[in-house]
UniProtKB/Swiss-Prot annotation:
Gene expressing this chain: prfA
A Gene Ontology cellular-component term: cytoplasm
Chief location of this protein within or outside the cell: cytoplasm
PANTHER family, per database record: LD18447P (PTHR43804:SF7)
Signal sequence region: none
Keywords recorded for this protein, A-Z: Cytoplasm, Methylation, Protein biosynthesis
GO molecular function ontology, one term from the record: translation release factor activity, codon specific
InterPro entries, alphabetized: PCRF (IPR005139), Pep_chain_release_fac_I (IPR000352), Pep_chain_release_fac_I_sf (IPR045853), Prokaryotic/Mito_RF (IPR050057), RF-1 (IPR004373)
Name of protein: Peptide chain release factor 1
Cell compartment(s), UniProt: Cytoplasm
Amino acid sequence: MSGSIRDILEEKLARFEKLENDMSDPEVLSDGARMSATAREHGGLNRLANQYRTFKRLTDEIHQCVAMVADAEDVDEREMAESEMESLRKERETVWEDLLSLTVGGEDSHRTRCVMEIRAGTGGDEAALFARDLFEMYTRYAEKVGWKTELMDASPTEMGGFKDVTLTLEGDNVFRDLQYESGGHRVQRVPETETQGRVHTSAATVAVMPEPEDVEIDLKPDDYRKDFFGASGPGGQHVNKTDSAVRLTHHETGIVVQCQDEKSQHKNLAKALRVLKARIYEKKREEEAAKQAEARKGLIGSGDRSQRIRTYNFPQNRLTDHRINLTIYKLDQIIAGDLNPVTEALIEYDRDQLRGDMID
């Protein structure tokens, strides 16, 4: 097993064991919010930790069989040890495949909550409509696989698109599967306003960030500035007479987030804090990823937002993912929420990059 994958597995097992200890700590037990966050993260790591423990046990038993074969005093004893070793290796290969599925997304693949930001790029109104289409594609996909979604903030346009929209998603494997969506998305189609039937190209960017638990990002009120203002609707018109919209500016990083989706200032503040924590955590992840770039350079789950990852060609009903040269002529189904063929191909690609790195 390569050092990077072994390190990820060891770190996750150590984290799981710490969470196990924390769940019996009186201080944690007395804090409902902390206990809930600890139990949620523990549950997300449970399968991986147990499978890795099984993998390590099987590896030890294989080593024992190797020694038994070497020390065998007769043919029967050696054949028995070889047969046992072959059985253990087959069992370990099955466990290893499962571990690959669980670790292919990196150290945050176990996260059950994430924040997604979709922003219109070049292309004016058509780009904003494409951003809306992406938003609807992801929410339909979430509904199909049983994830919960929550709208955090949106800047709608008069034509029904989005300049930008932020949502959270929660469920099993949510970050592992959606992290591959980070990057530049390009659309080629004939806009509704196009009278001569010409195909236009426009773009949007998607950023997917794991949502950290409250105990992981210690954010104090002095760490950020709060600004309150009136919420606005399509075209910028004022839609709220009270200053219910919230803008937060993190002093250390300069990160700015805002939320105006709720009528309540308190609810908007709570949502904005969740997004801010995710953005801060993502910045830390990016800094750590830069240090580990060499170890993970062959994987595509790094989420480089500057990278153009995908083209949606409506006249040809074609989706192309440029990272793995994947082309699917079922764009209508994918836009309707059937994202599985794309997601599974991306995960399998990364899994293949790791498949040969098993411990002997």
